[in-house]
Swiss-Prot record:
Gene this protein is translated from: rplX
Record keyword Disulfide bond present: no
Coiled-coil stretches: none
UniProt cross-references to CDD domains, sorted A to Z: KOW_RPL26
Function recorded in the entry: One of two assembly initiator proteins, it binds directly to the 5'-end of the 23S rRNA, where it nucleates assembly of the 50S subunit.
Membrane-spanning residues: none
Keyword terms of this UniProt record: Ribonucleoprotein, Ribosomal protein, RNA-binding, rRNA-binding
GO cellular component labels: ribonucleoprotein complex; ribosome
UniProt cross-references to PROSITE patterns, sorted A to Z: RIBOSOMAL_L24
Record-level Gene Ontology MF annotations: rRNA binding; structural constituent of ribosome
Protein name stated in the entry: Large ribosomal subunit protein uL24
Pfam family, one: ribosomal_L24
C-alpha cells in the first residue's frame, strides 16, 4: 500500500470529497486508512469501555476507516497526486509524487 501513517491525504470520492486530513492509522491487509476528521460515525459505547475519544459511555463520534482508493496523497504544493517509487543513491526505495517528481 502506497499510503502510510502520517501522510497528508485528500478524499477524492464519497460524502467527504475534498476533505484533507492526516492518516492516523493504515490497515494494509484491509486496504483501508483512518484519516483525521474524515468519515466520522456515531458509535454507541458501554460505560465500562474506553474507545478512541471516549472518556465514558454513551454515543461517541469517531473516525471510521476509509478505502485507500478513495483518497489521494497530497504533494508538496497541496495538489492530489499518485505515488511512484525510485531508488536513491544508497539503493533505498523512496516514494515520489508523480505530479512533480519530488520525494514524499
Amino acid at each position: 500500500m502506497k499510503i502510510h501513517k502520517g501522510d497528508m491525504v485528500i478524499v477524492i470520492s464519497g460524502p467527504d470529497k475534498g476533505a484533507k486530513g492526516k492518516v492516523i492509522e493504515a490497515y494494509p491487509k484491509r486496504d483501508k486508512v483512518l484519516v483525521e476528521g474524515v468519515n466520522r460515525v456515531k458509535k454507541h459505547v458501554a460505560n465500562s469501555a474506553t474507545e478512541r475519544g471516549a472518556e465514558s459511555g454513551g454515543i461517541v463520534t469517531q473516525e471510521a476507516p476509509i478505502h485507500v482508493s478513495n483518497v489521494a496523497i497530497v504533494d508538496s504544493e497541496g495538489n492530489p497526486t499518485r505515488v511512484g517509487y525510485r531508488f536513491d543513491e544508497n539503493g533505498k526505495k523512496v516514494r515520489i509524487a508523480r505530479s512533480n517528481g519530488k520525494d514524499i
